[in-house]
Amino acid sequence: LDGGLDFETLALSCSAGCSGCCDRVGAACWSQASPRVVKGRFDSNSYPVPSRGSDGTSDVASLYQRMPPERGRPAPSLESQLAVTLPATAEQSRGTQMQLPALRNSYAQLPERFFAQTGPQPVSEPRLIRFNRPLAEELGLDADQFTSPDGVEMLAGSRFPEGLQPVALAYAGHQFGNFVPQLGDGRALLLGEVVDVNGIRRDIQLKGSGPTRFSRNGDGRAALGPVLREYVVSEAMAALGIPTTRTLAAVLTGDPVHREVRLPGAVLTRVAASHIRIGTFQYFAARHDTEGLKILADYAIERHFPQLSGQARRYRALLDAVVTAQADLVARWMLVGFIHGVMNTDNMAISGETIDYGPCAFMDAYDPGSVFSSIDRVGRYAYANQPRIAKWNLARLAETLLPLMSTDENEAVAEAEEVLRSFQPSYEAVLRRGFRRKLGLLTEAEADLQLAADFLDVLARGEADFTIGFRRLGDDLDASEGQGTARQLFRDPAAFDAWSVRWRERIASETADTATRRATMHAVNPKFIPRNHRIEAMIQAALGGDFTPFDEILRVVSHPFDEQPEMKGYADPPRPDERVLQTFCGT
């Protein structure tokens, strides 16, 4: 916007893949997502870190002077960190024992500056809303233990077994383009880790469990509404096949939280591959703590990308792996019309999972400029801007890794820029493959992406529903030209009819039978998404003590591709009086 682009132009140019404003070095313009990194100096909008020079900037060269990339204390191996068995049975003050499984915490074995240890904070009346038994089974956890009175108290953050090492993680981050050198888990606690049935290590974290050292005068609590929203949306994303954190449980605390009004308090139990964020790396870079950066990077490699451990240029390989994971993730968001709403660098996990469902939303009518977050006043995180912002965030990650990649600054910058340039082709490859399947195209043709783009244009001009539009294409495979249910979405179907002729000609060029094609389309075009008006109605009902809508929508979106005729109302778009125009973080 500071480059003279109005929002409408920016949204359209983002949608078209225009790179006209992407050539500035550093972070001077929030809208650019340059595959370049700051060289020699951190821009004042990028890293307002300690030890500033007279010109108001900070010298990145000092990051190199602190410690060469292959020296300093190495991070202990993940297995060695987990070698200590933590006892899980504790004698409590009321004379009972908490019989709960041991949760080991490898992150708590890192240096103390990585986190803040935090104990339990009692709540008045913890009450289980819902426990995710299928997920517990996947994690190898005993659901009966966690749903026992002792288990519910732990899930509320009210009591912990002896030996548990709950920690709040330190991190920094760019929030709407402005760098904050210390954020951290202000209302979350990492309880520990489990290894699931697939051999994957997963974090168990409480969200809304009370204040920590990073709360910044906040109450550290979560209201019921945002907890239920994250439960439903995260489980919907998992069912859609999109990498995401999961929800193990939701618990009422019995205590109120005060936002604009008095609301019931709740705690969410989040499961994640890890909680390492781009902002975690920024935290150490901002402090010129190259030793901390190296420990963090080595830990991240061993935890998420162990195949990189023996590589000579493993930090470049780490950046490359994160770039690839984020390109894949954001493309998948775009394919289902998901808008994260707050793509700050502290809300991007290096694991490639969707994390931090605050003011998130799914589009109803297709509009590339869709913004729902009440705090996103200029559309920084609009639907069409998401791939651009992801690139911008990854450039900030690359800046933190420069001193680890090479002792030669020019060489490090060149390597980082080369890796960042791979984002766009990786993103576009996933997008092309996804839209081809959404259109029922089983072979590749050069014009397929244009065919998809033209359908999106038809949807936009007709203000037609994104999810229903694609789903009905599969329903209409047997329909005659000029017939079918998809064209009923348009007041004037002429543009759709013209596009449909081209689409049917493309389909006719393939030999697949209709049943196979429809099955392919219905496997990627959901019938159900967690629509914003349904989420809002669910929250309002729960605030009144009725959790039936919560149970219903959770059941529906857990099977998004099934017809579920008895629940067909959940597939309908909102009436004009039901439309949700803004979503809120709840902090």
Annotate each PLM feature:
Residues 346-348:
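Hydrophobic residue at the +6 position relative to the catalytic HRD Asp in the kinase catalytic loop
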Residues 226-227, 256-340, 351-450:
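ATP-dependent phospho-/nucleotidyl transfer catalytic cores
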Residues 343:
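Hydrophobic HxD+1 residue recognition
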Residues 94-171, 372, 377-587:
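Regulatory N- and C-terminal appendages and interdomain linkers associated
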Residues 13, 43, 50, 56-58:
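Periodic, rod-like helical contexts
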Residues 2, 6, 23, 43-47, ...:
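Intrinsic-disorder-associated, low-complexity terminal segments enriched in Asp/Asn/His/Tyr and depleted
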Residues 125-128, 134-146, 151, 156-310, ...:
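Conserved ATP-binding subdomain of kinase catalytic cores across diverse folds
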